[in-house]
């Protein structure tokens, strides 16, 4: 029976690839169904012989307990946005300072959810959400139910690929019709529907909703030398790659493509929100490098946002964790980009003055970056009042005088004991990208603060399980889970804590770079600003901000209290060892290694202080080669770069 099951699995997987990937089926639906039923019968009779890549895994129901955290071996960066031709020209100018004659590749920006797929020996072992770029959620079982994701590859590869998982418009209409018939709330748009589907604990629901994917990148070190060749290779492996793309030599060609896509946008069977422009040559990408948050070799052009008219009813002023006071407009409700909008940001007092926004004005509302509702401008022809908005002079939280510094556009409260700032700081500290304390959201933090149970972040770690039972609406089970989540967060790697402290200009990426270099927050506390500023991708602004924070009264006490409560202050990831054998060197791995897995070789190089990259360029210091090294070895020899073999690496 095992032989026949092998035959059926191979046949059905081939037919599925023809149908979903190539759009060129070689058998009828009825023949596919007949073979599928035969396989189901055999697997029912011989469950111990079910194969890992059987297509029946895609439809079976499985109720999951939840989603585990998963550390990305290759971090996912954000893309810099562009909203105009001028911003694209500026991007091109920056690229041409480093690369003489760049060729660009333009791809559609799918409005879906970023995913990372890892295969070992050609078998799908992990499907993960983007998360914060470093840590995502393991949703492998759900992604196995997405029919166009290969469970196995035609080669026994160790490879990680990236793409977008989305819901086609036709599937979205079907899902919403079913929800309407069942009396369930409809999804606002296909992206929300895809996100909700991938968060399902019942995998049978995922299988029914017909999600789809477009893959766009090999995240693990590639043997291809361009993005275009990489996309073609992904197609050869059986992944679905969006065919709508071009190579361009200049911004004129890119702009023409953007205009063409914009005209076709509404007729596509899926949602897009822009065009991604990348430098095509991977060695040039390597040469350009990254900022703290984004690659310098790519930009995402975003289409102009949908705009609607609404009437301004009133303005709320709220204080953020850094003391900035932000105005928010209350509006007559309007439908915008698939959701009902009744509140929109007014940004700051300078923006209100610049746009001359007045009481009861009719305003144009849009979603900035297709996400945040914002007031764009006033419809002056519909103005009914000349009365200006009331601008506060005192903090709406603590009543302290508000300041408007000359070099800032916002009002600011500088009272360090301002309740709103403290509470917002606590919410930030517990958030997913910071200490990731599950369940400790804004409502619980507000109740803890109101009950005088927490005044700073160290107090969170002094809480006992019974303290939560003092809060309205919190039962024993919830209290136990909250306490356990707080205890678990003590073990986080220290970059999560550093970001959680809310130091101005120190984001999650900068926190990771700092801890990779200094190894612990205590070492960072002792460091001078010149050493911080010398770290690649950081600079003087972050160094000055850290110096100001650590010099402030109470910072040393807070760190000591956190340590005393058991919070980890050390970095648990791969550190940069200043005096290691390969410290500061840029190394490329290429070819087939005989004894080490590629991931093992990469980890060893990084432990020796090297930065491992995927392409050979003039910035490369060393190339480690295995069998069939190919074009990367040739390029290294042409550039006079030092070449070593696997035996040399093992000897270190």
UniProtKB/Swiss-Prot annotation:
Outline what the protein does.
DNA ligase that catalyzes the formation of phosphodiester linkages between 5'-phosphoryl and 3'-hydroxyl groups in double-stranded DNA using NAD as a coenzyme and as the energy source for the reaction. It is essential for DNA replication and repair of damaged DNA.
- Enzyme Commission number(s): 6.5.1.2
Q: Which residues form the BRCT domain?
A: 577-652
The entry's family comment says: Belongs to the NAD-dependent DNA ligase family. LigA subfamily.
Q: What is this protein called?
A: DNA ligase
Q: Which reaction does it catalyse?
A: NAD(+) + (deoxyribonucleotide)n-3'-hydroxyl + 5'-phospho-(deoxyribonucleotide)m = (deoxyribonucleotide)n+m + AMP + beta-nicotinamide D-nucleotide
Q: Which residues bind Zn(2+)?
A: 395, 398, 413, 418
Q: What organism is listed for this UniProt entry?
A: Streptococcus pneumoniae serotype 2 (strain D39 / NCTC 7466)
Q: Binding residues for NAD(+), per the UniProt record?
A: 29-33, 78-79, 107, 130, 164, 278, 302
Q: Which UniProt keywords apply?
A: DNA damage, DNA repair, DNA replication, Ligase, Magnesium, Manganese, Metal-binding, NAD, Zinc
List the catalytic residues. 109 (n6-amp-lysine intermediate)
Keyword check for DNA damage: yes
**One annotated GO molecular function:** metal ion binding
Q: Which SUPFAM superfamilies match?
A: BRCT domain, DNA ligase/mRNA capping enzyme, catalytic domain, Nucleic acid-binding proteins, RuvA domain 2-like
Identify the Pfam families for this entry. BRCT, DNA_ligase_aden, DNA_ligase_OB, DNA_ligase_ZBD, HHH_2, HHH_5
Q: Which GO terms describe its cellular component?
A: cytosol
The prosthetic group or cofactor this protein requires is: Mg(2+); Mn(2+)
The GO annotation for biological process reads: DNA repair; DNA replication
Keyword field contains Oxidoreductase: no
Instruction: Name the top EC class.
Output: ligase
């Amino acid at each position: 029976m095992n032989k026949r099951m092998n035959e059926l699995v191979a046949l059905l997987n081939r037919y599925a690839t023809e149908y979903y990937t190539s759009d060129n089926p070689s058998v009828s639906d009825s023949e596919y169904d007949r073979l599928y039923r035969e396989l189901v019968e055999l697997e029912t009779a011989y469950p111990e012989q079910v194969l890992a890549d059987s297509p029946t895994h895609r439809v079976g129901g499985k109720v999951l307990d939840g989603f585990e955290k998963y550390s990305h071996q290759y971090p996912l960066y954000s893309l810099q946005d562009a909203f105009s031709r001028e911003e694209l020209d500026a991007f091109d100018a920056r690229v041409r300072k480093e690369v003489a004659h760049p060729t660009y590749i333009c791809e559609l920006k799918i409005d879906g959810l970023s995913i990372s797929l890892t295969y070992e020996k050609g078998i799908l072992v992990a499907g993960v959400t983007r998360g914060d770029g470093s840590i995502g959620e393991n949703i492998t079982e759900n992604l196995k139910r997405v029919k166009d994701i290969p469970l196995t590859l035609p080669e026994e590869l160790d490879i990680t690929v990236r793409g977008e998982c989305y819901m086609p418009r036709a599937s979205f209409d079907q899902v919403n019709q079913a929800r309407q018939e069942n009396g369930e709330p409809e999804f606002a748009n296909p992206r929300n529907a895809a996100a909700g589907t991938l968060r399902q604990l019942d995998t049978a629901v995922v299988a029914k909703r017909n999600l789809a994917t477009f893959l766009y990148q090999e995240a693990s070190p590639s043997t291809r030398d361009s993005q275009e060749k990489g996309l073609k290779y992904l197609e050869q492996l059986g992944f679905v790659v969006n065919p709508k793309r071009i190579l361009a030599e200049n911004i004129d060609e890119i702009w023409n493509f953007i205009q063409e896509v914009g005209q076709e946008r509404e007729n596509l069977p899926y949602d897009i929100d822009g065009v991604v422009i990348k430098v095509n040559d991977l060695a040039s990408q390597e040469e350009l490098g990254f900022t703290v948050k984004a690659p310098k070799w790519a930009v995402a052009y975003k289409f102009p946002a949908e705009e609607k008219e609404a009437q301004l009813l009133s303005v709320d002023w709220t204080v953020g964790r850094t003391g900035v006071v932000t105005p928010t407009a209350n509006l007559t409700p309007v439908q915008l980009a698939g959701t009902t909008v009744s509140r929109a940001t007014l940004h700051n007092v300078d923006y209100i003055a610049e746009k001359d926004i007045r009481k009861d004005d009719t305003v144009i509302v849009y979603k900035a970056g297709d996400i945040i509702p914002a007031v764009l401008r006033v419809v002056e022809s519909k103005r009914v009042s000349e009365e200006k908005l009331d601008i506060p002079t005192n903090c709406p939280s603590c009543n302290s005088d508000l300041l408007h510094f000359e070099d800032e556009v916002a009002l600011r409260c500088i009272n360090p004991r301002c309740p709103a700032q403290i509470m917002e700081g606590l919410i930030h500290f517990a958030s997913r990208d910071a200490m990731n304390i599950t369940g400790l959201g804004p409502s619980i933090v507000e109740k803890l603060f109101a009950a005088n149970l927490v005044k700073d972040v160290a107090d969170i770690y002094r809480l006992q399980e019974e303290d939560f039972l003092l809060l309205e609406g919190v039962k024993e089970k919830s209290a136990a889970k909250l306490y356990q989540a707080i205890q678990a967060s003590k073990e986080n790697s220290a970059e999560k804590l550093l970001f959680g402290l809310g130091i101005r200009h120190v984001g999650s990426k900068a926190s990771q770079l700092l801890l990779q270099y200094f190894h612990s927050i205590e070492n960072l506390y002792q460091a001078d600003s010149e050493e911080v500023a010398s770290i690649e991708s950081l600079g003087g602004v972050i160094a000055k901000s850290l110096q100001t924070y650590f010099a402030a009264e109470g910072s040393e006490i807070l760190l000591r209290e956190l340590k005393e409560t058991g919070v980890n202050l050390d970095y648990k990831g791969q550190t940069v060892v200043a005096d290691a054998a390969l410290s500061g060197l840029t190394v490329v791995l290429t070819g087939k290694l005989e004894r080490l897995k590629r991931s093992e070789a990469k980890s060893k190089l990084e432990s020796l202080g090297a930065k491992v990259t995927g392409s050979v360029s003039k910035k490369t210091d060393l190339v480690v080669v295995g069998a069939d090294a190919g074009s990367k070895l040739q390029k290294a020899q042409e550039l006079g770069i030092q070449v070593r073999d696997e035996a040399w690496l093992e000897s270190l």
